């Protein structure tokens, strides 16, 4: 499973690429997501990672505590907030 995820996700200086789609954000947020992904991403899978990236773009966490807070919310309430993340992100892209 990890190999398949590795093929679908890539990290740049200010972006995360998932399934040929680029998500742009601060370098600090990319680094945090990459750090977490390298340790736990294989457990959660690519769909969780995409939700996390979208949530980071929407929430724009500014420091380490905020980054953990955003991650914690998604881990605890993924099922309930996934439709909301997608709705807000789709409007955010416009």
Curated annotation (Swiss-Prot):
It comes from Sulfolobus islandicus filamentous virus (isolate Iceland/Hveragerdi). This is Uncharacterized protein 19.
